[in-house]
């Protein structure tokens, strides 16, 4: 994506502007109070909500919808827990209704997850593409969660997805950017925003994603499971801002040899 800095450096997804490039989740927090504090400290403007867990009032999700000020934060319903394209499409439709119930009448966003493997939680590329094609036809703003596959990312862009969301490493693993080279290829070839999702464990990894040109990151476990979630949320926000500024500034070229920082002429003994 374009690295030219602007005075109002906003991210645009599906025609909606976001000042914050840190997206967060709502799961895994010890309690809703810590979630609220963390969202506030993160300065995030979009959070994911697992539609199935809210609908079934799963553990930790009771009262979730009432705990968030939806006039300030944009809801990103996700299809977590769906194992097939058909299931994901159905849950996406429920998510759109959930957003409307929260007062976001025109919210068509969906984070598309199709994950048949409950052990490794790796997304199904075929099911994701199938579901994405149908949801785009239905007018959804689709943000698909994918393996860091440059060919799949481009195909999803071509069918009309609003972003692509390659994983840094498996969900909740905290392994960081294990797929950095592939993510770099996705960024280089993308004409839509690239959001690195999953695997980020510490702020330096979030910063690294932005430094390499990612447009945003989505971080949940690293905040929710930290010893002090609100403090970690603030640290992530600072790291994302720093990473974005570093990308805009442009890093010095990597060299095989040393390059002196002081002049080599005009020395005392010359």
Curated annotation (Swiss-Prot):
The answer to whether keyword Protease applies is: no
Question: Which pathway, metabolic or otherwise, does it act in?
Answer: Cofactor biosynthesis; thiamine diphosphate biosynthesis
Positions of region (Disordered): 249-270
Q: Where in the cell is it found?
A: Cytoplasm
Q: Which residues form the active site?
A: 111 (schiff-base intermediate with dxp)
Q: What keyword terms does UniProt attach to this protein?
A: Cytoplasm, Schiff base, Thiamine biosynthesis, Transferase
The molecular function GO annotations come to: thiazole synthase activity
Enzyme Commission number: 2.8.1.10
Q: What family does the entry list?
A: Belongs to the ThiG family.
Name of the protein? Thiazole synthase
Question: Gene that codes for this?
Answer: thiG
């Amino acid at each position: 994506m374009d690295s030219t800095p602007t005075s109002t450096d906003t991210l645009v997804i599906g025609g909606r502007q976001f000042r914050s490039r840190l997206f967060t989740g709502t799961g895994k927090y010890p309690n809703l109070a810590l979630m609220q504090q963390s969202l506030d400290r993160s300065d995030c403007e979009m959070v994911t909500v697992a539609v199935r867990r809210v609908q079934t009032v799963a553990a930790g999700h009771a009262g979730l919808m009432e705990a968030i000020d939806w006039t300030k934060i944009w809801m990103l319903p996700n299809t977590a827990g769906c194992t097939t394209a058909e299931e994901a499409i159905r849950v996406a439709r429920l998510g759109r209704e959930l957003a409307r119930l929260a007062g976001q009448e025109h919210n068509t966003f969906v984070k598309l997850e199709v994950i048949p493997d409950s052990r490794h939680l790796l997304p199904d590329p075929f099911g994701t593409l199938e579901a994405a094609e149908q949801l785009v036809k239905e007018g959804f703003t689709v943000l698909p969660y994918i393996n860091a596959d440059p060919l799949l990312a481009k195909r999803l862009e071509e069918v009309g997805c609003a972003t692509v969301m390659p994983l840094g490493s498996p969900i909740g693993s905290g392994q960081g950017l294990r797929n950095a080279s592939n993510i770099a290829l996705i960024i280089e070839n993308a004409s839509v925003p690239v959001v690195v999702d999953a695997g980020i464990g510490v702020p330096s990894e979030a910063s690294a994603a932005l430094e390499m040109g990612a447009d945003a990151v989505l971080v949940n476990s690293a905040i929710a499971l930290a010893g002090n979630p609100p403090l970690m949320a603030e640290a992530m926000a600072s790291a994302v801002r720093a990473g974005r500024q570093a990308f805009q500034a442009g890093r010095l070229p990597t060299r095989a040899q040393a390059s002196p920082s002081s002049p080599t002429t005009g020395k005392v003994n010359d």
